[in-house]
């Protein structure tokens, strides 16, 4: 699309710009919250941004005859939602209402955008512009964010998930590309420190696993001697970090002494489940009791709300684990089949990435994988748009012909 201002012309790829806006939308909304401190203004901006993106997606789907991409997932969701309403009755009314709005305006939109976006140098150039905003967001949060009753910085989990994809993406791009490596190193180091020092432990784990996936894909292209050298280098780095762990921790705690991640690490409680094991035990027993019949969407909230109280994804308590959530909602047999089919697609997409060997596509794939990884211990697939970005890419990349078209531009 070309915009004209007198004699000035500006060529814009609308699909690409909307995709980049969507990826950074939660961060932008949180910045508005911090600056204004006004819930009504924040909600208006949030609704405006997501409605604008949803409008673009609907128009794009109609113009490019991609309506089936939306209808397929949309119809499946409606069918499962109606089944849940039939099984659970009024217990899921409010959950379905608020959850459906989020699923349609964010998750389904994220799936569509990622399923159809052209991942190339142009997309990387478009997303690079947002790193100035990401850095400003980190500075604003560190200096303007308020503390809660426990002395922790409010919204630290939201903050860390907001910068997770940009941090992982630029870190991978820094590793694999020599051009502009010094600047990428500075930015990725700054963002990684912010993620660890100011954020939650979950996003740090997501980034670490994503980097491991990236290394695995890259090593597949190396001859044996290079694989041995790489493994030796990573092992040496891990040993050095281990022996210098106390000094590193003390330095990071000097930056933010209230960091929950660093305090847990210092006290040896980094892998504490924070009562998640209680949720898992209840869901496991319920799945064993009725392994065939499904319970319906959001049904894990219903059963856990009967045993616990507190805030969560949408309302009350929730599974905090993709496997338990799917198995309980869809039943052990059907849910297991869904998980098996999906992870077969993930495996195929990774093998196709190895075959294509495209640096930019691999970088985006691994960065978006953080969305799925986070579902193993936090959030819910029904409200997490980052996970649906990855699901969209998996659906696209599990088809080798489609991936080849993306790679060739």
Locate the predicted segments by residue:
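Interfacial loop-to-transmembrane-helix boundary motif in multi-pass membrane proteins
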Residues: 16-19, 66-78, 101-104, 111-139, ...
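N-terminal signal-anchor transmembrane segment
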Residues: 1-62, 77-90, 138-143, 373
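Hydrophobic transmembrane alpha-helices and their immediate junctions
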Residues: 66, 329-372, 398
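A membrane-periplasm/extracellular boundary helix in multi-pass inner-membrane enzymes
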Residues: 193, 197, 218-266, 284-285
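Transmembrane alpha-helices of multi-pass inner-membrane enzymes
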Residues: 54, 170-172, 364-376, 380-409
